[in-house]
Amino acid sequence: MKIFRRPDLLFGPSGSCFDGFHAFATNGSTAYLYRFSYVQSALREKMRAGAPHGGEIAYVFGTLTAGRGVTPSAEDTAVSRMAHSYWVNFATNGDPNGPGLPNWPPHDPKKDLIFEFKPDGSAGAGPDPRKARLDVTQLNTEAGKRSDF
């Protein structure tokens, strides 16, 4: 059985995904880029590779107990409230920011920051630690070469 340990290469954000954000932001539109790296406390031992693709959905909708069979910790609930607040703010006024939330800046291709819901339950914008690896993946893909999985 092959275990795939590079989910960022499958689900992004891939280089082409970043290009889309760059194009969107460069044309005067506002885009908010994020990575969700938080894993529910009780599931961390099982999910050592990190948060799965779509892992933020249960946090955004506050459904942490649905089908998981675990009780959310206070930290899990706090991350869920934070994610929910960002999404509601964005849906309401086009800006995820609000009172009591860490600032989520719009994507700026010149600064190239990513907002991350971090493994420790905090959140904030900073340089993307995966950028160099994703740039290599993008270059190999554009050149018609298979990325090294």
What are these regions (language model features)?
Residues 1-149:
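C-terminal helix-and-tail extensions that cap enzymatic domains
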